[in-house]
Swiss-Prot record:
Name of this chain's protein: Gigasin-4
Top-level taxon of origin: Eukaryota
Tissue: Component of the organic matrix of calcified shell layers.
Amino acid sequence: WFPCEYECRVDWGSNRRQLRTCTKECEQERASCMTGSSDPACSTNKANNQLHVQFKTL
């Protein structure tokens, strides 16, 4: 989900409505990752949470 959110910022940074739509899809991806994967990138550790906070300010 990190690449998803980054790509949203790059592709839609100047269009707030499209950016919100894009990041909602990333949020669904993140939630799915957090609940259904053992991948370390999907854990809710402090580093991942700090990276995610940047995107939650939309």
